[in-house]
């Protein structure tokens, strides 16, 4: 054998990361456009860092290099500008393929629809990640990837999902909207198998009880049930999952429709018989499958078997069960192999340590910003250019963040707040528990408490805002008082137009009176 011979073909890369960046309707008015300029959800800041940077960093740390980033057409230019700036410095190892699709905030497109549309670009096993996921240091992506690598071959798993402890979070005004409550899930702890995810249809049909099939319990007699966990929307999937999606054109939501359906493949024989062979045959050519066959740890056995006919085992009708929690143990089914027959398992990693979140609603966006304030200590800038912008008589607490090129005026108080770049904070202002985006202006004597201000917001002198949100470009009048409101440019513009109209009518009336005299 010639060891000096250079191989003619490179080993293909194992995974493609598919990062989804949607409109962020639950984050309005922060994501509402500023005139002709869009405000992409992916670029909203968390601790003065665009939220999309968190999953991109996570990917790079895991060794993933190929990224398919999908966003609405209206956001493509803004996101392209951002990743072009960072790709050569912050993320040199990532090869980001930015693709856009036609969508509007009024007609949002679900994850399943997007994946079907870009199926031709997903040619290998893939990792699905939302742009709003903020992972903790205690959860490396390699935890999910390694679980998938082993179980997809040795146990026939088709995907691995990740769920995390639902944060309590702080209270937010009802006007901000409340995040959706976590959904009940049933899983097997010992094997790490997700068995059931409640759907909106399940809740509408019977909101008091779960309906589970006896065939589930015959495979996994000891299961755990909880509603304490939230879906991260991070999935490591076989390429064959895309093929199944193309056979299910009516599925739109991955979490609410497709994932619960995938769980049923594990214990419903008719579904296993119909889809199992396609999934299995597609997996045999995967690079990691070939490697595992030559591994010293590989036994040559798998739990992946398919029934000879869909009638080998008749699916039992759903049974109503009360909430339960017990140590789990799968059943020995085939020659001592642990796992259900015709596995097609949906693996699950349930993470319970460290602050984790999805910034897909206003409450979580605020809480994640506040969390990062506890991880840092503010000090005066070391460079003279930024240092002179902070008045020595201002008071800035250690648990605050001030962005570059931001000016803070005399006797201004900043406490437990994040202030972005290129902002101007006037004299004697008071800012407590707020998140202020870039390029905002807070004039003298203004008071802000528990607010999130969008890009280019201007707050007039001595105005008072309590737990308010502002759309990018909004202007608060001097001495204006607002509490628990979403302040949008359309409302402000309408009010300004009404005032101008009243002034115009008054002028016309005065002119008519003068003419009569």
Segments from the language model and where they lie:
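Unchanged
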Residues: 2-370, 514-516
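Generic "edge-of-domain/loop-turn" microfeature
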Residues: 24-26, 76, 168-169, 191-192, ...
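Short C-terminal domain-edge/linker segments immediately following a structured domain
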Residues: 129, 158, 264-269, 380, ...
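Flexible, disordered linker segments and immediate boundary regions flanking tandem C2H2 zinc-finger modules
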Residues: 142, 274, 377-383
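A broadly tuned preference for mixed-charge, low-complexity surface segments
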Residues: 282-311, 447-480, 486-490
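C-terminal, non-catalytic macromolecule-binding modules
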Residues: 370-378
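A structural motif detector for beta-strand N-caps
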Residues: 382, 386-395, 400, 406-408, ...
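C-terminal segments of enzyme domains that contribute to small-molecule binding surfaces
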Residues: 464, 472-517
